[in-house]
């Protein structure tokens, strides 16, 4: 498979097609946006500074694939990705999260992403170090070899001095190698050992109330270098110790300065921030009520989307080249209700179409992570073969579509509630049913859902 940087916009859309049904225009827009980033990297330095990303505004009802398109694109490109709700933020000066926090969160995600990649690179070395630490706990040197007391040294030092004969050392090494062999064969996984770990203490976290968690984290990080690191001995099985020690030993092998440097570069040049529910902060200007704060959030958002420098605990971060994708249903408000300056910062507008009954059929069958494939995989662990007939799939799609028309339209999310109700009995009885092949056809779907669908009160609560 090609690396992402070599993929054309058409190939990016084809990859997104594996997970998201329809919405071609939205896929096309994001594919062009990320491809332009790769093109920008190939430009001379003076041009690179001038070419800014074209931010995208997605307009469409809930459950049609807005978030999923952005998330899958980030996974495909290996970009740091953050999803935020515009309604979570408050204007500077009000209690709540400031919009600046989204950049800090993106950098944190980027650092963790790069750190995990570097840990993967040194995993083999870390496994060897973990093996040594487990062997130290299984065969402690002091217990493996007897103490030989030298009376002359005792007179000088005033205490006992451990001295080991060559024979003692040979026996110790032989015992250690014997245990190493057993460890590698997996014979000691349930053996209990005692290991020493550094205790992580966050004394400031409990002081700060809701909306001030960021401040608590910053103060904890600031004082973490000054506070003494407490060590605590813990008893655990070898299998558990391996999981605990592996990331600790791997972290010692990686250069955190290089990790931070690469993470900052990745966040600044490849970061994607998805701002959901932007329609909820749009509205006509008003001097009173909640609209004041909404206008304030838009004004606070503007410099970040335009390009500014935000201070984070890892260093300053420029937001000029971060790709912002905003999304909203815009049932009540319109994109023109956003402040004009913010409208201008989202030049690419894409309208996502509501899902049809035929789309629901395709969503159930086609994506690589399709709902029915997930249930088939889950129940196969109990030895149950789950078979969906074509008419069964179409009946589930029909009912989901009808419910969306009658009740609140929640898009493809309705399929999850319908599928869960259809397969509830099988999921419950799976370990005990004698017939391990279950066929889900239209008759089966109707039998499971008919009463609930007909009773509007029931369907409003259950489906």
Curated annotation (Swiss-Prot):
Keyword rRNA-binding: no
Similarity field: Belongs to the ClpX chaperone family. HslU subfamily.
Cellular compartment(s): Cytoplasm
Record-linked Gene3D superfamilies: 1.10.8.60, P-loop containing nucleotide triphosphate hydrolases
Subunit structure, interactors included: A double ring-shaped homohexamer of HslV is capped on each side by a ring-shaped HslU homohexamer. The assembly of the HslU/HslV complex is dependent on binding of ATP.
Reported temperature dependence: Optimum temperature is 75 degrees Celsius.
GO (cellular component) term, any one: HslUV protease complex
GO terms, biological process: protein unfolding; proteolysis involved in protein catabolic process
Keywords: ATP-binding, Chaperone, Cytoplasm, Nucleotide-binding
Protein name (Swiss-Prot/TrEMBL): ATP-dependent protease ATPase subunit HslU
Main location: cytoplasm
């Amino acid at each position: 498979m090609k690396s992402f940087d070599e993929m054309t916009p058409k190939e990016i859309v084809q990859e997104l097609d594996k997970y998201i049904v329809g919405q071609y225009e939205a896929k096309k827009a994001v594919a062009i946006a990320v491809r332009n980033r790769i093109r920008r990297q190939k430009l001379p330095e003076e041009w690179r500074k001038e070419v800014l990303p074209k931010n995208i505004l997605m307009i469409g009802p809930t459950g049609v694939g807005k978030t999923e398109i952005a998330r899958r694109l980030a996974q495909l490109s290996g970009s740091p990705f953050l999803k935020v709700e515009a309604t979570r933020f408050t204007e500077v000066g009000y209690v709540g999260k400031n919009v600046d926090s989204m950049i800090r969160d993106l950098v944190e995600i980027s650092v963790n992403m790069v750190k995990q990649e570097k840990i993967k690179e040194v995993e083999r070395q870390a496994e060897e170090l973990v093996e040594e630490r487990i062997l130290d706990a299984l065969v402690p040197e002091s217990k493996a070899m007897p103490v030989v007391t030298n009376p002359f040294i005792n007179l000088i030092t005033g205490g006992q001095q451990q001295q080991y004969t060559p024979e003692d050392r040979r026996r110790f090494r032989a015992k250690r190698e014997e245990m190493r062999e057993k460890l590698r064969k997996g014979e000691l996984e349930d053996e209990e050992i005692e290991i020493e770990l550094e205790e992580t203490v966050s004394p400031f976290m409990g002081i700060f109330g809701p909306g001030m968690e960021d401040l608590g984290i910053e103060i904890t990080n600031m004082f973490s270098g000054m506070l003494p690191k407490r060590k605590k001995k813990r008893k655990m099985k070898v299998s558990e110790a391996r999981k605990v020690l592996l990331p600790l030993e791997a972290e010692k092998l990686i250069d955190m300065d290089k990790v931070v440097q690469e993470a900052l570069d990745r966040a600044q040049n490849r970061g994607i921030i998805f701002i959901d529910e932007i329609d909820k902060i749009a509205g006509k200007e008003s001097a009173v009520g909640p609209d004041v704060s909404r206008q304030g959030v838009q004004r606070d958002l503007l410099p970040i989307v335009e390009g500014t420098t935000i201070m984070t605990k890892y260093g300053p971060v420029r937001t000029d080249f971060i790709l912002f994708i905003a999304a909203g249903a815009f049932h009540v408000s319109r994109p023109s209700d956003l402040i004009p300056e913010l409208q201008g910062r989202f030049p690419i507008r894409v309208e996502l179409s509501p899902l049809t009954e035929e789309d629901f059929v395709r969503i159930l069958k086609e994506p690589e992570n399709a709902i029915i494939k997930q249930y088939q995989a889950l129940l196969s662990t109990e030895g149950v073969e789950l078979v969906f007939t074509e008419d069964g799939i179409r009946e589930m799609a029909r009912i989901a579509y009808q419910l969306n028309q009658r009740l609140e339209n929640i898009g493809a999310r309705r399929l999850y509630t319908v599928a869960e109700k259809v397969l509830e009995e099988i999921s419950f009885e799976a370990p005990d049913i004698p017939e391990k092949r279950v066929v889900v056809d239209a008759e089966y779907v109707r039998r499971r859902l008919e009463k609930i669908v007909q009773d509007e009160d029931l369907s409003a609560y259950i489906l």
